[in-house]
UniProtKB/Swiss-Prot annotation:
EC number(s) recorded for this UniProt protein: 2.1.1.223
Top-rank lineage group of the source organism: Bacteria
GO biological process: tRNA processing
Name of protein: tRNA1(Val) (adenine(37)-N6)-methyltransferase
Keywords attached to this entry: Cytoplasm, Methyltransferase, S-adenosyl-L-methionine, Transferase, tRNA processing
Entry-linked InterPro entries: DNA_methylase_N6_adenine_CS, rRNA_Ade_Mease_Trfase_CS, SAM-dependent_MTases_sf, Small_mtfrase_dom, tRNA_Adenine-N(6)_MTase, tRNA_adenine-N6_MeTrfase
GO molecular-function term, one example from the UniProt record: rRNA (adenine-N6,N6-)-dimethyltransferase activity
Family matches, as SUPFAM superfamilies: S-adenosyl-L-methionine-dependent methyltransferases (SSF53335)
Amino acid sequence: MAFTFKQFHIDDMNCGMAVGTDSVVLGAWAQLTAAKTVLDIGAGSGLLSLMAAQRSQAHITSVELDTSAAEACQHNFHNSPWANRLTLVNSSIQDFCQQIEYQEYFDHIICNPPYFEQGTQAIQSQRAMARHTDSLSFAALLDAIHVCLAPQGNASLILPMQSMARFNEILAHSQLSLIEITNLISIVGKSANRVLCVLAHKTHPQIATKISDITIRELSGQYTQTMVQLIRDFYLKY
């Protein structure tokens, strides 16, 4: 399926996961404007990378394991206004991290990671790989962020609320800390079902976690004003 945003176009036909609200919100919410280098882990169609390119002057490295998704991603990069700032690497993030050098630390890392535990069935194999934590466990993701993130850098993720307890358990044994969370609420009156997270290298003393909420839709089904402000630079409707 193809999606046209204000400044770029996405074809996600060969990608395991289609363009969705989670990635759009993450790409619009992440604090990228000051970053000179950005790493997109599990780039898929390249949506997060393209949003980062639109919102900053950063050079962006996009790592995607699946070959078909990587081809679609490269196509989308080539057809964008920022092709000279976008680099695709068809590799696992684990292999990529083994090759990284000090000079390649990233100011910001963005990732919409797999979120289904082993045993949950997905219809297509690509979709299964994109959605199952088996392809990138939380422990492996946090290790990759620790290796690739610049000393003063941040990493922005989006996770299901039901995965947060497990994520925090693994995070507690890592070299990273959670410095900000924004609870994402699908509609007024509901409980949050997604969490936007900002990670940084651990400091002493620890920084208190900043907490906030974003509600996506009013009871009428229309986007809230907060959501409109977040996505207005991307959606044609606004």
